[in-house]
Amino acid sequence: MTESSPDNRAQIDWLQHQWVIAGVVASAARFVPIPFFDDAIRTQCRRFVVARTLAASGSSLSTASLKPLYGESGGLVATSLRAIARAPLKLILFPVRKIVLIATSIHGVPMEIMKTVLLGRTLRRQLASGTIDPGRAKAMRLALEDAFARMDFHTLRAAITDSLRGARSWKASAIASARSLSRRPLASEEAMPADDQIELTATRVQKVLDRPETAKLFEEFDRRFDQAYAARSTGAPR
């Protein structure tokens, strides 16, 4: 089945819709005044993207084997110790950090959606090209960050912001979904909690992503990711 076949195109569209929903929910966590909430929800949403993409691609890899793509790498003890060490400083800075997140939401929300979608897109591309070595997951994450930092997403960011303005009450619905996630993490086969308003919002955002100019922009991102990933994998200068 080729990527341009109707069945495969429909699967890609469905998968991208799931990525957008996850990005919308992740972006709304910044509006909840609870310490560590946004980090935890972002991790869960990105884990969902990885799990959904692996399942849709028919991969035998476990979600946990690609943990560097959505959370901190390393063992449970090491991860817990790092979190404990950072907790006091994060609590002290929480009020300032939260104010900044809310004040910059007009930029931060669409950027969070884009990052979530590009995580899924890149993982799907890598799975389509062959087997992924879980040992290179951290290099993949760093290459994603490298490529994203080198892109000019101003026009796309503005278009996504406009699409969100046209969706009423998306923020309240997304916050409710984020709170639901915080109470009970998703099992790997579960869908992201999304009501009709979130579905509508995701559909509006997806129309922006389906534009020809967005496709060209994402192709450029793919090229830059491939370069960064190759450099990260070989240790060559970027």
Regions found by a protein language model. Give the residues of each.
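Membrane-active amphipathic alpha-helices enriched in small hydrophobic residues
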Residues: 24-32, 37, 77-84, 88
